[in-house]
């Protein structure tokens, strides 16, 4: 069984891979980085007009980083919304993914947090800078290979 979006992508020969369904029956699809821009636009046009959340995680020490998008298709007059989870995996050596800020404005702070914590750079994001850590912070704190500095700058709390 595939989601309607997955069926549509197969029909139009757009490359993706199903990673299965979660406990709520929501399908997770793996999207190639080079296809993410077009599949994001297609998802929006297909009706996934709400970005419920975007997050990122480190898959394994020295391995890939993942940017995860939970999309919801909300249409007037339907009782049950459709949801899909899209994952884009990138190399930690060059973690660059096209931003979807221009499609879903709610991606703004979420992509910035993923950048701040894991170092994933979102191409064409208009405000890509640290959001939680100070600008002077070195490294990406949520990467599994992150080495915590043995010093912390004491800051005036005034």
From Swiss-Prot:
One Gene Ontology term from the biological process aspect of the record: photosynthesis, light reaction
Superkingdom in the source lineage: Eukaryota
Q: Which UniProt keywords apply?
A: Chloroplast, Membrane, NAD, NADP, Plastid, Plastoquinone, Quinone, Thylakoid, Translocase, Transport
Report membrane topology.
Answer: Peripheral membrane protein
Spell out the reaction equation it catalyses. Answer: a plastoquinone + NADH + (n+1) H(+)(in) = a plastoquinol + NAD(+) + n H(+)(out); a plastoquinone + NADPH + (n+1) H(+)(in) = a plastoquinol + NADP(+) + n H(+)(out)
Q: Which InterPro entries match?
A: NADH_DH_suC, NADH_quin_OxRdtase_su_C/D-like, NADH_UbQ_OxRdtase_30kDa_su, NADH_UbQ_OxRdtase_CS
Q: Name one GO molecular function term.
A: NADH dehydrogenase (ubiquinone) activity
Localization:
Plastid, Chloroplast thylakoid membrane
- What is any Pfam family matched here? Complex1_30kDa
What does UniProt give as the signal peptide span?
Answer: none
Q: Which GO terms describe its cellular component?
A: chloroplast thylakoid membrane
EC no. given is 7.1.1.-
Read off the PROSITE patterns from this record. Answer: COMPLEX1_30K
Q: What does this protein do?
A: NDH shuttles electrons from NAD(P)H:plastoquinone, via FMN and iron-sulfur (Fe-S) centers, to quinones in the photosynthetic chain and possibly in a chloroplast respiratory chain. The immediate electron acceptor for the enzyme in this species is believed to be plastoquinone. Couples the redox reaction to proton translocation, and thus conserves the redox energy in a proton gradient.
Q: Which family does it belong to?
A: Belongs to the complex I 30 kDa subunit family.
Subunit and partners:
NDH is composed of at least 16 different subunits, 5 of which are encoded in the nucleus.
What is the name of the protein in this document?
A: NAD(P)H-quinone oxidoreductase subunit J, chloroplastic
**Protein species of origin:** Dioscorea elephantipes (Elephant's foot yam)
Gene it is expressed from: ndhJ
